[in-house]
Amino acid sequence: FKDGLQVDRRLARLCPEDPLVHYNLACSFSLTEEFRKSAHALRKAIQRGYRDFDHLRRDNDLEPLRQTDLYAAIEQEIAELEAETD
């Protein structure tokens, strides 16, 4: 997972506005159990337009993060965004 994390970090520097890059970075941090960094990257992805929330909720790479209190706060933010679009 460490090699993937290095690639994702590099991509985040090269493409700072790409939501998918930050989403993938969140996944890498989750898999390496760096949960604060994972939550931060996931928030950046959402702020930059990531909206595939169904995938986010099922993605095995984010499972470690979903087991933390940090994710509960993100899920609340997602619910608010979903309510705005209904």
Q: Where are the predicted features?
A:
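Conserved structural position within tetratricopeptide repeats
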Residues: 6, 10-13, 47
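Start-of-helix register in tetratricopeptide repeats
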Residues: 20, 54-55
